[in-house]
Amino acid sequence: MEMPETSLTISRAGISMYGLYPSEEMDKDNMKLIPAMSIYSHVVYVKNIEKGRGVSYGQTFVADKPMTIATIPVGYGDGYPRNLSNKGYVLINGKKCNILGRVCMDQFMVDVTGMDVKEGDKVTLAGKDGSEEILIDDLAALAGTFNYEFVCDLGKRVPRVFVKDGKIVGTKDYFEDDYE
C-alpha cells in the first residue's frame, strides 16, 4: 500500500488489522488507520489510604497524602505490561487515573482521589472514554516495547468481544465457552 510501484498483488496486513501502523516511518497521510481494538475492565475495589501507606508489592509507591485508590482486575498474567508499574494510566469516567505501585499478576491499583468512583465502574485500558483516549502505541512506548508486542501479549484470560456498529456481534471467552 505504501509502495504502489511494486509488482506484487498482495500485501501483509499484520498489525494494520488492529488499525495500528507498523512503524513510525510510515506515511500516515497516505493510509489512514483507525484503531480496531479497545481494552476494558472494571473497578473491583475502592479504598482510602493514609499518607505514608505503600501500595502493591514492594511498596514502590508510597502515598504523600491521604488518597483513594481503585483496584483493577487485570495484570501481567493477562498480558498487561508490568513495565507500566508507576507510570501507566487508565481512564475511569473519562478521567485519567495513574497506576500506583506495581502491576501484579492479576491486578493493579490506580489513583482515583477526588473522583466519584465505585465498584463496577468501567475502566478503559486502551481506547476512548468521553473525549479522552489511550492509544496502544502510547502505552507500548511507556512500557518500553512496541505495538506488536502489546497486542500479541494479551492472553487467553482476556475475553474477546466483537462489536460492529455499536452492537456485539460475537464473543470468545476461552474460560467460559464450551469446547467439544
Regions found by a protein language model. Give the residues of each.
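Active-site anion/phosphate-binding pocket segments in diverse small-molecule metabolic enzymes
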Residues: 1-180
